[in-house]
């Protein structure tokens, strides 16, 4: 169990362990209705390429069960549902009710409903039976989790033997000279876009800070392996601005 008195980071701030979950919930409740538009603006649409690359490497097949954790507005779920077909199932899970509603409404509007289920749940204590999913994806959600080790343990528990974990997340730029440019953009431009488009500068300031506080590629690889996943490797995308970690449960 998590120490009730322990502190953790919320962006660059130190907060009580249990307070972070509440604060993150407030951020995503605030950004939910503008989430897709902001993603397009902030990444110049490149996030769609990162997600499609993730799906290409998933090798998900018809009839399989997939968990899209922190699935938010449903980008990965949409693509995964096409892969598993009517005989499979994708569970879109998110801790935030506002984000879950955005994803559900969006996918229903697109006529996608036969093989998608929606669950509100905490990544640290997933409400699924052991060995439930052939593949677990988590796109841009892990950095917002309070106890990442506990969440990864929970993912390992619900992953089937022979199954795969895929974590797509902002990471640490590896190209020389890219990091200062990226930092300048993140802290000077990104919050201003949030203020102009969504009238919410503070939430996007947090998002920039949360990226900087997230473990780098090698640290996250070690964390994933520590809970039992094997053969963990990662792909740096856009010079390491984003990394896709892939690991297996044997």
Curated annotation (Swiss-Prot):
For this chain, one GO molecular function annotation is:
demethylmenaquinone methyltransferase activity
Q: What is its EC number?
A: 2.1.1.163, 2.1.1.201
Task: Give a Pfam family name.
Answer: Ubie_methyltran
Give the record's pathway: Quinol/quinone metabolism; menaquinone biosynthesis; menaquinol from 1,4-dihydroxy-2-naphthoate: step 2/2; Cofactor biosynthesis; ubiquinone biosynthesis
Which domain of life does the protein's organism represent?
A: Bacteria
Q: Which UniProt keywords apply?
A: Menaquinone biosynthesis, Methyltransferase, S-adenosyl-L-methionine, Transferase, Ubiquinone biosynthesis
Taken from the UniProt record, the cysteine pairs bridged by disulfide bonds within this chain are none
| HAMAP family according to UniProt | MenG_UbiE_methyltr
Belongs to which family?
Belongs to the class I-like SAM-binding methyltransferase superfamily. MenG/UbiE family.
From the Swiss-Prot or TrEMBL record, give the protein name. Answer: Ubiquinone/menaquinone biosynthesis C-methyltransferase UbiE
Gene symbol of the encoding locus? ubiE
């Amino acid at each position: 169990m998590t120490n009730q008195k322990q502190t953790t980071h919320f962006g660059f701030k130190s907060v009580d362990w249990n307070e972070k979950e509440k604060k993150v919930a407030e951020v995503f409740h605030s950004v939910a209705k503008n989430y897709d538009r902001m993603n397009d603006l902030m990444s110049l649409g490149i996030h769609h390429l990162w997600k499609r690359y993730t799906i290409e490497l998933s090798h998900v097949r018809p009839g399989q069960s997939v968990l899209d954790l922190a699935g938010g507005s449903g980008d990965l779920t949409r693509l995964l549902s096409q892969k598993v077909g009517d005989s499979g199932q994708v569970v879109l899970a998110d801790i935030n009710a506002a984000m879950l509603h955005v994803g559900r409404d969006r996918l229903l509007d697109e006529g996608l409903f036969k093989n998608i289920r929606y669950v509100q749940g905490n990544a640290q204590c997933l409400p699924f039976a052991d060995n439930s999913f052939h593949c677990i994806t988590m796109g841009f959600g892990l950095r917002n989790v309070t106890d990442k080790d506990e969440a990864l343990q929970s993912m390992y528990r619900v992953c089937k033997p022979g199954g795969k974990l895929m974590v797509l997340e902002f990471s640490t730029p590896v190209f020389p000279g890219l990091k200062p440019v990226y930092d300048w953009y993140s802290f000077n431009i990104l919050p201003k876009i949030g203020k102009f488009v969504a009238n919410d500068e503070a939430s996007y300031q947090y998002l920039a800070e949360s990226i900087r506080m997230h473990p780098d590629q090698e640290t996250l690889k070690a964390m994933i392996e520590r809970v039992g996943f094997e053969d963990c490797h990662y792909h740096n995308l856009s010079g390491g601005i984003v990394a896709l970690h892939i690991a297996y449960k044997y």
